[in-house]
Amino acid sequence: MSDTIEHIGSGSVIQHGKLNDRVYLMKLKKDDIPAVLQRLEELTEKEHYAKLFCKVPGSLSQPFLEKGYIPEGHIPRFYEGKEDALFLSRFNDTARLLNKPEVELERFRQLLSEPLQQNDQSKKWADYRIRRLEKAEAEQMAKIYAQVFESYPFPIHDPDYIEKMMEEDVAYFGAFRGDELAALSSAEIDFDTQSAEMTDFATDSAHTGHSLSCLLLHSMEEAMQRQGIKTLFTIARLASIPMNKTFLRLGYQYSGTFINNTRISGRIESMNLFYKHVQAER
C-alpha cells in the first residue's frame, strides 16, 4: 500500500493516503492556490485525514495561515537561493498533535545541547567507494530498502518505482565494497528551486557501524554542487539519533520538528528538518 500522487493546475503536487494518514503538499504554484486549498478541504471531508502538511513559499503562506495552518519549520532562501520555504501543518485529529513523543524530543534536545565529536572516519571508509546508481541495479536497491524499512512514505521497495524516480531527477548513490552494494541514498533534485532533498538512506545490515550515511551524504553534496544546486535539506526521523548526528556533523542547521508526520518502519514518526546552503559550482 502506498499513497497517491496528484498533480494540480500548473505544477502543484500533493501526496495523500491512509498509509501516512495525511495530505502532503509537496510543491505549490501561485496560480494554483485556490484549487489546491479546495482540494485539501475536499480530501479532509472525504478521507478524514489526520494531518495536512504543506511546503509553501513564504510569500504564498497567508491563505494557509488564515485556514488554521501552523508553522512547524522553515528553510531560509530555499527558492533559487532567495525566498524562504515554510512548512505549515493543520491537525484535523487533535490527538495527533498532542500525543508528542516526549522521550524522543528530550533525547534530541540533549543532542543539540552537546558538542559533537568530529571523528576521523577514513579508516572505516577505506574499503568503500561511492558512485551513482543505475536502473539495472534497481532490484538490488529495493532489496536493501525492504530489509531496512518495514514501511516507508514512498514505495522504495518496488524496483519499478525506483526506475521511474531515476527518470524524474532523483539521483541514487551507492556505497560499494568490491562489487557488493552496502548502502545507498538519494538526492531528489528540483532544478526550478535549485534545491535537493537528501533522503532514502539505508545500509545493509552486514555493513552497519561504518558511518556509510556520512560518506554518502558528503559525496552527494559534491555531486549536487556540480549540478548548480544551492540548498540541500532533509526530513530525518526524530527517533534516529545517528542520522541526526550525521547531518549536524556535516554542518546542517536544525530548523523544526514535524510532529507525528510520517509512517516509517510500521509506525507514524515525528521528523526533524535540517538544511544547508552550498556554493553551486556553475
Map each language-model feature to its residues:
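Conserved GNAT acetyl-CoA-binding A-motif
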Residues: 44-56, 224-236
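Conserved catalytic-core motifs of GNAT/GCN5-like acyltransferases
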Residues: 55, 70-86, 253-268
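Short, cationic low-complexity segments
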Residues: 103-129
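A short beta-loop-alpha structural element at the N-terminal edge
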Residues: 126-141
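Conserved acetyl-CoA-binding loop-helix of GNAT-fold acetyltransferases
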Residues: 31-42, 203, 209-226, 245, ...
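A conserved beta-strand-loop-helix scaffold within acyl/acetyltransferase catalytic domains
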Residues: 5-22, 28, 142-205
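N-terminal charged segments
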Residues: 1-47, 53, 61-62, 66-67, ...
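Conserved beta-strand-loop-alpha-helix junction that forms the acyl-donor binding cleft
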Residues: 53-61, 234-244, 261-264
